[in-house]
């Protein structure tokens, strides 16, 4: 009976220590991810200074978890989503945020959002006129931002 309790407390103790280690690692990883939010917020403010549009700036949301996307802009919620896992390099994050900012800049009405969707159906993503422009602006602005910062 004493050996049962000994093993029980050893196993419970090991699980407790492992859970503490796990929480500590999560805390350290979260601190490392903060650079992404700070950089994205700085780039967003920089874009707003260069290309002001409306009073209400877009919300910025950094998303954890797997995705095939680097980022996206949602007109209805006025939100730019950045997928952390696909923006681990400074250049990629700046380029993605600049790209999505230009979607925000160009899609400023329901009719323009509808036009984007119609063109997406007609041209596809790679040949979409707005995607071509946003890709070019994202790359150009990323070089300019990183050169100065």
Predicted regions and their residues:
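A metal-dependent hydrolase signature that marks the N-terminal structural subdomain at the beginning
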Residues: 2-70, 74-79, 88
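Extended low-polarity, hydrophobic cluster-rich segments
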Residues: 40-43, 94, 98, 136
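Surface-exposed helix-capping loop/turn segments at secondary-structure junctions
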Residues: 49-56, 110-113, 145-149
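Short pre-active-site segment immediately N-terminal to the catalytic Zn-binding motif
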Residues: 80-97
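Post-HEXXH active-site segment of zinc metalloproteases
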Residues: 91, 107-136
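Active-site recognition of the HExxH zinc-binding catalytic motif
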Residues: 95-108
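Long, well-structured alpha-helical subdomains associated
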Residues: 124-127, 138-149
